[in-house]
Amino acid sequence: MYNSENCIFYYISWEMTPTFIGGKKQAGISGGSQSPQLMEAFLKRNLNRHFYYMMEFVILKSYNDRDKISLQFKYREYKIMRNIKITIEYDGSRYQGWTRLGKDESNNTISAKIIDVLGKMTGEKNIELNCGCRTEVGVHAYAQVANFKTSSNLSTKDIQHYLNRYLPMDIAITEVEEVPDRFHAQLNAVSKTYVYRMTIMDVPSVFERKHTYHCFKTPDKKAMQQAALLFIGEHDFRNFSTAKKSKNTTREVYDIDIYGDNEEMQILIQADDFLHNMARLIIGTLLDIGFGLRKKEDIEAIFNGEKTVGNPCDPKGLYLQEVEY
């Protein structure tokens, strides 16, 4: 991909054995009688070999006599944009989610922190960082996926090292790879998986309290599993979301798995995509059923708008586990 905003025009007068073009490295043309067309072909072939740029040549004037050949031309230089995919692990406790849109846009988001470091690393402005799944306030990620375009020639290893050196300690880049230009972290995702972690004990763990939801009694796992079946498949999740202005609120839930014992429990939910707060509201509803605050029949009533959804689950126990492509 070429970034037309960063193209530069050069106007060059060239004679038989040049040393530099615009201060760049020697192209290596040797003496001898060559036509302007052959010289042009040589320049294209050799400059593109030595520099991470793509040249576009236009001959303005040329002449050839016994003693010398001269070629006056202009070329346009495009910086080649690379597409970089990164995998990110983060503790979302102190952030306002992956990103915030509109008037409430905040710098205290995961994406803002990464974009700030990317700008310093590349010297580029207005970097667009696409993510696989926008996590909400306080939600964590084991493997968020994002991509961005850059003309930097840093290796993927150097990019990873730079980001991990300058990002906050609660954000880590676990993998960096160069991908085809058409890859888009959000548009190419085929499924997204969240996992909700809970502990069940009389005294909450001091070390787990910020990253798991604590229950003082064990929810009815069997009742939750039966209720979870009502979410499987394609439904209009408008009433299980806070995204009231979304035009398309139909999503397909592939799987909900509830497992664990009397001390720890996890809820895994996989779907093609999630509306804003959809995962939290589904999990919150299942917990209400597990604690006897609702019946599974309420799920159908909420879908139909006959009843209102309850409170979303506490975000501190929710993790984006995987984005599949």
Where are these regions (language model features)?
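Structured-RNA-binding interfaces characteristic of tRNA pseudouridine synthases
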Residues: 63, 75-325
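Short, positively charged and aromatic/hydrophobic N-terminal segments
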Residues: 2, 19, 54, 59, ...
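Ala/Thr-enriched low-complexity intrinsically disordered regions
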Residues: 17-19, 27, 41
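Cationic, low-complexity basic patches in intrinsically disordered or flexible, solvent-exposed regions
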Residues: 26, 35-38, 45, 57, ...
